[in-house]
Amino acid sequence: MRVVVQRVKSSKVEVDGKIIGSIKGGLNVLLGICKGDTQKDIEYLVDKILGLRIFEDECGKMNKSLLDVKGELLVISQFTLYGDCRKGKRPSFIEALGGEEAKKLYEEFIKKCKEVLGEVQMGEFGADMLVSIENDGPVTLMIDSKKVF
């Protein structure tokens, strides 16, 4: 499982011209799920993301987490995070988990986040979405639960 975590001033996701999720400040998380991902991957990433100290403290140092600043969270499924571009010009998505299995893990990820935060904004799994992100910093991090990078 891998994520792209972005500290944002605001972020929103639209499906068919309707805003289905939006936040004013916090973290935008793009979530990719691959074959072999389990509950352990979810637990690792939720703990890591919610505890990341990437918000500034009173001295301007990145020292506070999303929980510390009472920020909001927007999670969007993104199978293309497992696009393999090493051969040819067209990405291969063979490692990405699809269908109901991936949806179940995505929903479990959201559930774990909600257990800590109470409320979580989200995209629509499998939908064609328009995502607007106003980066803050910018601060953008990639995390892989298998610690590939």
Curated annotation (Swiss-Prot):
Residues of the signal peptide: none
Annotated domain remarks: A Gly-cisPro motif from one monomer fits into the active site of the other monomer to allow specific chiral rejection of L-amino acids.
Protein name per Swiss-Prot or TrEMBL: D-aminoacyl-tRNA deacylase
Subunit structure: Homodimer.
Keywords annotated in UniProt: Cytoplasm, Hydrolase, RNA-binding, tRNA-binding
UniProt keyword DNA-binding present: no
Catalytic activity entry: glycyl-tRNA(Ala) + H2O = tRNA(Ala) + glycine + H(+); a D-aminoacyl-tRNA + H2O = a tRNA + a D-alpha-amino acid + H(+)
UniProt-listed Enzyme Commission number(s): 3.1.1.96
Subcellular location: Cytoplasm
Function noted in UniProt: An aminoacyl-tRNA editing enzyme that deacylates mischarged D-aminoacyl-tRNAs. Also deacylates mischarged glycyl-tRNA(Ala), protecting cells against glycine mischarging by AlaRS. Acts via tRNA-based rather than protein-based catalysis; rejects L-amino acids rather than detecting D-amino acids in the active site. By recycling D-aminoacyl-tRNA to D-amino acids and free tRNA molecules, this enzyme counteracts the toxicity associated with the formation of D-aminoacyl-tRNA entities in vivo and helps enforce protein L-homochirality.
Name of the gene: dtd
A GO cellular-component term linked to this record: cytoplasm
Gene Ontology MF annotations: D-tyrosyl-tRNA(Tyr) deacylase activity; Gly-tRNA(Ala) deacylase activity; Ser(Gly)-tRNA(Ala) hydrolase activity; tRNA binding
Motif (Gly-cisPro motif, important for rejection of L-amino acids): 137-138
Similarity comment: family membership: Belongs to the DTD family.
